[in-house]
Amino acid sequence: MTKLVNEMILVLDFGSQYNQLITRRIREFGVYSELHPHTLTAEEIKKMNPKGIILSGGPNSVYDENSFRCDEKIFELDIPVLGICYGMQLMTHYLGGKVEAASQREYGKANIRIEGTPDLFRDLPNEQVVWMSHGDLVVEVPEGFTVDATSHHCPNSAMSKADKKWYGVQFHPEVRHSEYGNDLLKNFVFGVCECEGEWSMENFIEIEMQKIRETVGDKQVLCALSGGVDSSVVAVLIHKAIGDQLTCIFVDHGLLRKGEAEGVMKTFSEGFNMNVIKVDAKDRFLNKLKGVSDPEQKRKIIGNEFIYVFDDEADKLKGIDYLAQGTLYTDIIESGTATAQTIKSHHNVGGLPEDMQFELIEPLNTLFKDEVRALGTELGIPDEIVWRQPFPGPGLGIRVLGEVTEEKLEIVRESDAILREEIANHGLERDIWQYFTVLPDIRSVGVMGDARTYDYTIGIRAVTSIDGMTSDWARIPWDVLEVISTRIVNEVKHINRVVYDITSKPPATIEWE
């Protein structure tokens, strides 16, 4: 087995929804980082040879009977350890300190004051704003530890035992609301763990190509190609690794955006000289979706049908052992892990049949969306593909709320095309992270000409984001929204009203279903 990286920071997962952000921040520094279950043994960790270990936050109390724990022997490995929030409390509990329930849960921004010149806060201001999210707190640090930071509600906001390179912070440095959080993590990664920062997208390509070759050998791979950013990058990466051992299957399920099916075939079959098989499965998918309105059921149906289509094609091709998918880190987070609650199932991770005939290859499942775009650029994929709007696996099937019909699909397809065209016309396509239209399952009264109408409403969803974990609604200029609204009402049949979604994530998700 090829050695993948020379230096790595290991993050142990105790259930916080922020956990993936820790790995992301560290990779931004040019240091490879992986998230693993808290159940890893000290011996397993030793074999991984990390430069440092981070114990993540989580929803438990260290005194709960079923709270998440880790192997206490990690403190015997002579590897630097940073505990964040619950991770700090668990460290305290294991090493002889005292943790208690706080008299008042602390959630949101807080001011801390640094005591002395601790390693984690080197060259940082003595007072700073951090993001707190905890119900318990450390009331007595373990023997030999010093208190490095205090706040009004949390007198032990940070602690350390410098000679052992053990550190704890009650707040979340990985969240952007902690104004010097990145600097603190850098001090741990570079100052304490002595990493050099050698990891890059170029390095990632080499690593993943080698992993693909070692996994696949001389066997054949099917790639679920949709033409979106994720599947496109997967296809090009795998094709670069194993060439003609890859066959791309493009399923036209009738749930695609306007002009997308034709564009996919031209780009990949002609432009990249890949073996692409187009499967016309419109009727198959729509028949399965007939009468179904529950969003989770729609996702499961579409996910299952995708796999069954690939099964059928694999039978025709013979000798296919692997299926490649563009699953991202955010897909896995939102679908839930052993330690995190499910928000909604994702097409790439939640709808797979138990009797699937092939093994999965998911080379992007440690990357966020913006990292995938950077990877695509490094692979030489054209900007029009790399910067294409994120598009869910179930396609327009989850942008038609309620039952999916041909008429409703055409409404969403045409309105979405108008939105994308006008965003591009006004030079906003790089300023807005994602934008699309949805069709709620409601009608309203309107007046067009001299006649009363009773037709559908189109919702516009446009958000700004960095990684899809959180987002804010995009401030599209009113005059641009006016043009979009006017065009949709006049050019799309059965629409008499347009609304704009001004909800952030959280509390909403980016997609409506």
UniProtKB/Swiss-Prot annotation:
Nucleotide-binding in keyword set: yes
Pathway(s) served: Purine metabolism; GMP biosynthesis; GMP from XMP (L-Gln route): step 1/1
Main EC class the enzyme belongs to: ligase
Any one GO MF annotation of this record: GMP synthase activity
One Gene Ontology cellular component: cytosol
Domain GMPS ATP-PPase, chain residue ranges per copy: 199-388
Superkingdom of the organism of origin: Bacteria
Glutamine amidotransferase type-1 domain segment(s): 8-198
Oligomer status and interactors: Homodimer.
Function, as annotated: Catalyzes the synthesis of GMP from XMP.
Protein name as catalogued: GMP synthase [glutamine-hydrolyzing]
